[in-house]
Amino acid sequence: MFFPIDASRADMSWYLKVIEQVATQGHMDALALVDTFGVLSPHAVRYFVRHTRERIKKPLETHFHMDFGMGVANTVIAVAEGAEVIHSTISGIGERAGNAPTEDTLLALLTMYGVDTGIKTERLTKLSRYVRKIGRLAMPANRQIVGDTLFDIESGIIASWYKNAAKDHFLEVFPFHPNLVGQRMPRVVLGKNSGLDSIRIHLDRIRVKATDDQVNDILLRVKAASLKKKGLLDDKEFRRIVKQAVRS
């Protein structure tokens, strides 16, 4: 595989001459489309791939970085234009902002384009956590696909939606089922953005009955406590609030 580093920033006519010469006079079993510094846009990738394919008839591979957050989109566009091999890394580890994340790329191809790579996507979350552990890598808890809190529901309006629709129409509430990537099932959490149904869900969980006025009082107390704590409330804190509100 011929890997012309930083090809995306080279003069296009010069680049095309170089790859054509290597393809005809040297040894090239495949060509990597290399965007070393992640500077290409999806529109530029389409142009890049089409002109490359017009010049040489070799299998194309993608190698895109995430410096501007375009690595996954660029990879998908390149595949749609005929690239056959994808270079990606688990959770996007790599130089600077990293490479196109494997998880994101796989899910985009599978759910948006119907491309099944044969990879067992239900193992992605476990694999990502393992890589993070051995690599001592920090990652946002709400990271797409494999984040630890990705399926937490704090917003009151989403909690109501989940309560009313998820049992029979799960994909009305989420873009994909957590089982698809080995994630846990959703949970409603309690914080400053909670709503009345958030409270009702947790009251049902701990088997406490409350009037509408008490539910509203509990919600106000939950919001105030969350703002003071600057974070979500745990079960012990919620039970304490419920005890205070139901007694008063």
Whereabouts are the PLM-identified features?
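Beta-strand segments within the central parallel beta-sheet cores of soluble alpha/beta enzyme folds
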Residues: 32-33, 61-64, 88-89, 118-127
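C-terminal helical cap(s) of enzyme catalytic domains, especially alpha/beta-barrels
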Residues: 94-120, 124
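Active-site-proximal loop/turn and secondary-structure-junction residues that shape catalytic pockets
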Residues: 4-9, 35-39, 64-70, 90-94
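Alpha/beta enzyme core
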Residues: 1-58, 75-81
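Predominant activation on well-ordered alpha-helical scaffold segments within soluble catalytic domains
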Residues: 16-20, 46-53, 73-80, 87, ...
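Conserved structured core elements
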Residues: 12, 16, 30, 39-46, ...
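A mid-to-C-terminal "edge-of-domain" accessory segment
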Residues: 114-248
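Glycine-rich phosphate-binding active-site loops on the catalytic face of alpha/beta enzymes
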Residues: 81-98
